């Protein structure tokens, strides 16, 4: 059992921020739920490790299935309840499953070169297996299909499909899209009713990558050693919230400065642009959830690279040292990502700082 430590079942808990003193006023933020209980989980694992050819070839295979019941959620509530109508409740059941594979090779070659290379690949999937009727509206995009029926993973997002940019007034008039504009985003009419409504939404975002992978390489030769670690994910959706600032003028902070991507926005002399035309208002609601913000977040990163040298014993004996090693190390040195990804770091598509690149020099001594 786990999870209840993250939420409260009462309506009276007080949370103090900043100064740590009681504020001069209070407001209701949620309703009590005396029936709230802990989430429960059951997990099954199976795996094996192996070594072959006197330890030169080694690896492992692992698999797991994990079922979580009575998940804690904060479902939508009736607007008539007003402020403080939210309430934590036990809701969906979720099944997670996945596998991990690792394969390595180590060898000391006749030339004096030692190597140890390990590659790993893993994937996991999840599926909502139960969703109470009271929660269906929080996890559905039509009146008939919810997360259970769709087979989509937990955390999937619904939204509108962007077909492109309106090139002229004739396209706007024929679309039936409310408040459409020339140079604005054109949404797909999925239900074929000649207009854009909530029923034209579909599943647009999958939070689970196809697989993750890594590669460790360690080499040594006559006192020198070199190690590196590569890590990546493949076929992962990223919901790029930075586009609110980089691709639009009026969705948020209309009075603030913007990025240089706006210089390439659509206009009558730049009709091939995929960035909507600039506007001082957002009457077309172009910040709504849509495929415009979903990008390919696949990447490969050089997480760590280190070069070292162990001083010879003949030198160390003069100073009564047992070991001495100097090294140069770097972290987050290289990122290979999709050309279609517009944010700088696929791991930080929001407004967090990207992972910093760092380089360090070190000396290790033993006596």
Model-derived segments and spans:
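Extracellular/periplasmic, surface-exposed regions of secreted and cell-surface proteins
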Residues: 1-152, 285, 289-367
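C-terminal region/CTD detector
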Residues: 213, 227, 236-238, 317-319, ...
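Outer-membrane beta-barrel transmembrane strand signature
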Residues: 21-53, 58, 148-229, 274-304, ...
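Membrane-proximal, glycine/serine-rich, low-complexity loop/turn segments characteristic
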Residues: 3-16, 135-139, 169-170, 218, ...
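Extracytoplasmic gating/loop element in the C-terminal half of outer-membrane beta-barrel translocons
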Residues: 233-325
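Conserved small-residue
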Residues: 3, 89-92, 106-207, 238, ...
């Amino acid at each position: 059992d786990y999870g209840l430590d993250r939420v409260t079942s009462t309506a009276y808990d007080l949370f103090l921020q900043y100064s740590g003193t009681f504020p001069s006023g209070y407001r209701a933020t949620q309703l009590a739920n005396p029936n709230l209980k802990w989430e429960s989980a059951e997990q099954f694992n199976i795996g094996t490790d192996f070594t072959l050819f006197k330890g030169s070839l080694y690896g492992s295979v692992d698999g797991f299935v994990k079922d979580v019941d009575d998940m804690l959620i904060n479902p939508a509530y009736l607007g008539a309840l007003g402020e403080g109508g939210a309430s934590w409740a036990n809701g969906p059941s979720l099944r997670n499953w996945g596998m991990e594979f690792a394969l390595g090779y180590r060898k000391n070659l006749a030339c004096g070169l030692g190597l140890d290379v390990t590659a790993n690949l893993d994937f996991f999937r999840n599926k909502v297996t139960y969703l109470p009727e009271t929660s269906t509206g929080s996890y559905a995009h039509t009146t008939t299909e919810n997360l259970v029926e769709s087979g989509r993973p937990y955390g999937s997002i619904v939204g509108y499909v962007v077909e492109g940019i309106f090139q002229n007034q004739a396209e706007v008039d024929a679309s039936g899209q409310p408040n459409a504009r020339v140079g604005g985003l054109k949404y797909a009419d999925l239900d074929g009713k000649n207009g854009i409504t909530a029923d034209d939404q579909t599943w647009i975002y999958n939070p689970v990558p196809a697989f993750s992978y890594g590669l460790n390489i360690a080499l040594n030769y006559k006192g020198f050693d070199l190690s590196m670690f590569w890590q990546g994910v493949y076929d992962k959706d990223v919901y790029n919230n930075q586009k609110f600032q980089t691709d639009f003028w009026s969705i948020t902070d209309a009075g603030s400065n913007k990025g240089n991507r706006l210089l390439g926005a659509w206009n009558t002399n730049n009709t091939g642009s995929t960035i909507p035309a600039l506007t001082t208002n957002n009457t077309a609601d172009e910040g709504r959830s849509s495929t415009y913000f979903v990008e390919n977040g696949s990447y490969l990163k050089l997480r760590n690279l280190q070069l070292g040298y162990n001083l010879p014993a003949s030198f160390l004996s003069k100073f009564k040292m047992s070991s001495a090693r100097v090294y140069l190390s770097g972290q987050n040195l290289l990122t290979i990502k999709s050309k279609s990804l517009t944010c700088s770091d696929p791991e930080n598509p929001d407004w967090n700082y990207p992972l910093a690149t760092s380089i360090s020099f070190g000396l290790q001594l033993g006596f």
